[in-house]
Amino acid sequence: MTESHIDFRRAKFLISAPDIAHLDQYLPGDVGVEIAFAGRSNAGKSSALNALTEQKNLARTSKTPGRTQLINVFELDAQRRLVDLPGYGFAQVPLAMKLKWQQSLGEYLQKRACLSGVVVLMDIRHPLKDLDMQMIEWAVASEIPVLALLTKSDKLAQSAKMKTVNEVRKALVEFGDWVQVEPFSALKGTGKPKVLSILNEWCHPQWLADELENQDDAE
């Protein structure tokens, strides 16, 4: 089956849900393909989503880290969705709320069968914090590929940027092909073509092709 090119500019807001249980209620079953975006509250997740979809206000950015507490879902087409998970790890968020978020994130990664890939966004100046590693480990344990996206790469000189990229790749080498590491700048557009290529590949898993083929056969 030849992969079609997904136009990420067509992404549109679908629903918000407070946790994974409610997500199951709102969406039409655990079907199709979902690509999740996860990261610490100051990792630039909303800015990255807006840059990748070329929409200034698709994902709301906030000057207050930790404000995004909902799971926000954006539809690419009838079979494919982008999922913006709550930011994690912000110090001023109450402990009970932190624990609730972490439980929700863990449940989503471990239980969502249609999850085709996870983008873990990290500020390139502060990569691989404990919760970042936990997210990566959860995803790989569930056999979900990960893109470790080092955001705000425009904040570093080229030599420092590549040094950090290589250090992160070395730190994650134990996960093999399950984890890719790329630099990204929402401001400058650095890394955007590579990221879109990876997302496009994740939008075409073999099981979705089989699912659509079975639907055609049934008709």
UniProtKB/Swiss-Prot annotation:
Record GO cellular component, one term: cytosol
Record: residues binding GTP: 39-46, 66-70, 84-87, 151-154, 184-186
Pfam family, one: MMR_HSR1
Swiss-Prot/TrEMBL keywords: Cell cycle, Cell division, GTP-binding, Magnesium, Metal-binding, Nucleotide-binding, Septation
Entry keyword annotation includes Lipid metabolism: no
PROSITE patterns in UniProt: G_ENGB (PS51706)
Chain ranges of the EngB-type G domain: 31-205
Named cofactor requirement(s): Mg(2+)
InterPro entries assigned to the protein according to its UniProt record, in alphabetical order: G_ENGB_dom (IPR030393), GTP-bd (IPR006073), GTP-bd_ribosome_bio_YsxC (IPR019987), P-loop_NTPase (IPR027417)
Binding site for Mg(2+): 46, 68
GO biological process: division septum assembly
Molecular functions per Gene Ontology: GTP binding; metal ion binding
Gene3D superfamilies with a match to the protein in the record: P-loop containing nucleotide triphosphate hydrolases (3.40.50.300)
Keyword Hydrolase part of the UniProt annotation: no
HAMAP family reported for this sequence: GTPase_EngB
Described function: Necessary for normal cell division and for the maintenance of normal septation.
UniProt similarity note: Belongs to the TRAFAC class TrmE-Era-EngA-EngB-Septin-like GTPase superfamily. EngB GTPase family.
Name of this protein: Probable GTP-binding protein EngB
Species of origin: Shewanella sp. (strain ANA-3)
